[in-house]
């Protein structure tokens, strides 16, 4: 991926600022993050020893994420080597951390599970703390030839995510689904409600095979591999 010019970057940032707190932000934001040359972004809110997924988006065609979000939410976030730093970070701060800085602080099991097995070679994490939220905004890269994402733009991405999620009102829509297309979102909501492909197809007036296509597209974008992964990132 080529590096965007200053004008293009400014346009992306302006669009993100305009959409803060709205249901349009997620799509605008992932368009900006894609220009950073990363394969995946995940945003988790850590609250009272619990983790909640606010955004999971996969840009690469390669299979990288799989069950990682599901596994991370199932207690492994408590072993994140950056968790102690996030807990003590002051309000209105965004701190950048690279994988090389924390490798010595993670257990062998954690390293194997989240980095070696999925082939993640680089991770840039923004520890973003506001008035009520403490976020891990993680940017993953798997291409050994790719440069690390720009630190200033990465910090800005962390700041934008924090501003948005602090401002956004609670809705019935699980936050990770906000960046999907309307049809992809509808299919995921149908799955979350326990409906089968035939019933979802009837609701949308499409063929069941079309529902399966939308489901596959949604799962690929969300960086998940199964229904269980969808339930995990949506907190169901």
Residue map of PLM features:
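Amphipathic alpha-helical "output/dimerization" segments
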Residues: 145-163
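Recognition helix of helix-turn-helix DNA-binding domains
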Residues: 194-229
